[in-house]
Amino acid sequence: MNKTTSFKLSVMMFLEFFIWGCWFVTMGTFLSQAFSASGGDIALAYETQSWGAIVAPFIIGLIADRYFDAEKILALIHILGGGLLFMCSVALGFDKFYPYILIYMILYMPTLALVNSIAFRQMKNPSKEFPKIRVWGTIGWIVAGLVISYGVGWESSQKLEYTFYLAAIVSVTLGLFSFSLPKTPPQATNESPSLREILGLDALKLLKDTRYLVFFISSILICIPLAFYYQDANLFLNELGVENAAGVMTL
């Protein structure tokens, strides 16, 4: 993989997770402050991530991997996503906000697989090359939290709707940038995908490996408190009076 490709993939990862980090951590606080949302409403908003993850295999397995170039699908999704994030920022109530964030997450979650697919397809030695690319996603998430808290101060000034503005702008930027990414055509196949393949059920064979089974179970258990953390931690810290809570959580 040459330096130009490596740079483009790193930028892709940075922007991909910067977008998510802009609004996801502080969404609970935003909903509480802007709409006086109940705990149930906040839970519904964060639940959209799960719905997006459920739908993602159908979009990736049935459509993106077989009929279209991955970078073009990524571009289209992020451009559309930018519009949805903007609508989230101007929504006048939770009942208006929820449909936009639900549709957005159904579109966004598949992009997590798309960016990995685009990256892996350009690599000759993924085990060594991928970590250097993927780490820029983590950096993007961290930078987003620092910008919101310490950079522009939207959290302390209770202007968290601007986090969706910023995410919308960066989403469209990534969408346009995606057209410059290395061409990643669908892998040729003459066979129609089975439902088993679309859902990735063949991957369950990996559970026969005891080490992988332990990893799988551990991941599920870890994600249970993690869901509560993202949903409630920022709101909790803000109610305690912790300054720049999103930045503190990031660090």
Say what each PLM segment does.
Residues 44-62, 250-251:
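Central cavity-lining transmembrane alpha-helices of secondary-active solute carriers
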Residues 1-3, 181-216:
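Juxtamembrane intracellular "pre-TM" segments in multi-pass secondary transporters
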Residues 2-50, 211-248:
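Helix-loop boundary and gating motifs at the non-cytosolic
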Residues 55-69, 152-153:
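Helix-to-loop junctions at the C-terminal end of transmembrane segments
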Residues 14, 84, 94-114, 118, ...:
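Hydrophobic core of transmembrane alpha-helices in multi-pass small-molecule transporters
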Residues 148, 166-188:
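C-terminal membrane-cytosol helix-exit motif in multi-pass small-molecule transporters
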Residues 72-86:
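Structural signature of the two symmetry-related core transmembrane helices
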Residues 3-6, 89-101:
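Helix-loop junctions at membrane interfaces in 12-TM secondary transporters
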